[in-house]
Regions:
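Outer-membrane beta-barrel "beta-signal"
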Residues: 180-186, 242, 277-297
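Residue-level signature of outer-membrane beta-barrel architecture
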Residues: 73-75, 116-118, 154, 185, ...
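Residues that define the transmembrane beta-barrel architecture of outer-membrane proteins
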Residues: 61-67, 102-108, 140-146, 175-179, ...
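Transmembrane beta-barrel strands of outer-membrane/channel proteins
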Residues: 42-50, 86-92, 127-131, 164-168, ...
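Short glycine/proline- and aromatic-enriched beta-strand/turn motifs that initiate or cap beta-hairpins
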Residues: 35-96
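Sequence/structural signature of outer-membrane beta-barrel proteins
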Residues: 49-55, 91-99, 117, 130-138, ...
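Membrane-embedded beta-strands of outer-membrane beta-barrel proteins
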Residues: 67-73, 108-114, 148-150, 181, ...
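Repeated loop/turn-to-beta-strand initiation elements of outer-membrane beta-barrel proteins
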Residues: 77-84, 120-125, 158-164, 190-193, ...
Length: 297
């Protein structure tokens, strides 16, 4: 009887915890964050970029694959406008250049964001700190990367917000600093434009309550430790996507596009850098998310 009872309790506790997380996200997530049309509470992503492309085809052949799982867990304050948000994730890159052995690089990260609104003001601020373990084999010897961002938002109208800020991270190749500029724009009932450049920018169009399509740009700069130093990826992706809602919250995302100005480099910090000079290729992305939309579908 005991062996039967324990698994039932564990399954029930897991379901209750999941429902609590969803309830907190739906009911209490800060209003200032709702300028973006949705929040992905849990996301699974897989991207495959084969050695086939239309741009820069005369460089070294390369294949890339990517997998990640992540979540967003807000802890709101009493005013329901301010919050601390925990966004832990795991990711892995696989890369193979020409006929060399395939290499894998991993990341375990914990971004923590503090969202603060100012009473009777159109201004708000987001402060972010992120700790990451990036390596070809994560262990006790893996060096921790620490970085963060400051993002100031100005709500010009009910449907339009501008954002400015700066991002800093202690990458394995050195200190990486990047200015930020963003927008959250509800163009009309069917169209949205949102993102923070140079990281990402998304255009979204609603067909009906089950289907949305649009265009995406994202830029990725990360470094991972290895036996001799570091492996660095600079990946820029421009693509088209389709979101299919199976019900109110479960979403399948399909995206296809092309990389632009892709670079894979290795090196030793402040000493040497080697550029693999790889091709830009097509990419195909599949994602499954539990999504909360802040506007009526």
């Amino acid at each position: 009887m005991k062996n039967w009872f324990v698994p039932v309790i564990r399954r029930t506790a897991g379901k209750v915890l999941f429902l609590v997380i969803i309830l907190v996200t739906v009911l209490l997530f800060p209003q200032r964050m709702m300028a973006q049309p949705f929040l992905d509470v849990v996301t699974l992503k897989y991207t495959n970029s084969p050695n086939a492309g239309l741009l820069n085809p005369n460089k070294n052949a390369v294949r890339l694959q990517y997998f990640s799982i992540g979540t967003n867990l807000p802890l709101p304050f009493k005013n329901k406008k301010d919050a601390i948000v925990f966004s832990p994730y795991f990711e892995k890159w696989w890369s193979q250049i020409i006929y060399n052995p395939r290499q894998g690089h991993y990341s375990i990260a914990l971004p923590v964001s503090f969202i603060k609104s100012f009473p009777q003001s159109k201004w708000s601020i987001l402060l972010n700190a992120t700790a990451r373990l990036n390596d070809s084999s994560i262990s006790k010897r893996t060096n921790m990367q620490v970085g963060g961002a400051i993002l100031v938002s100005y709500k010009r109208t009910e449907n339009l917000s501008w954002k400015l800020g700066i991002y800093v991270n202690n990458e394995l190749f050195g200190v990486f600093v990047m200015p930020l500029a963003g927008i959250d724009w509800k163009i009309n009932e069917r169209n949205n434009l949102f993102g923070v450049l140079p990281g990402n920018l998304t255009y979204e169009h609603k067909i009906n309550e089950h289907f949305y399509y649009g265009a995406n740009f994202r830029a990725i700069t990360n470094s991972y430790g290895n036996m001799t130093g570091y492996w660095r990826i600079d990946e820029n992706q421009l693509g088209l996507y389709l979101d299919t809602y199976f019900n109110k919250n479960f979403v399948l995302n399909l995206e296809a596009g092309h990389s632009v100005l892709r670079k894979l480099r290795t090196g030793i910090k402040n000493t040497t850098t080697y550029d693999a000079k790889v091709n830009d290729n097509l990419y195909f992305k599949l994602a499954l998310a539990y999504r909360v939309r802040f506007s009526k579908r």
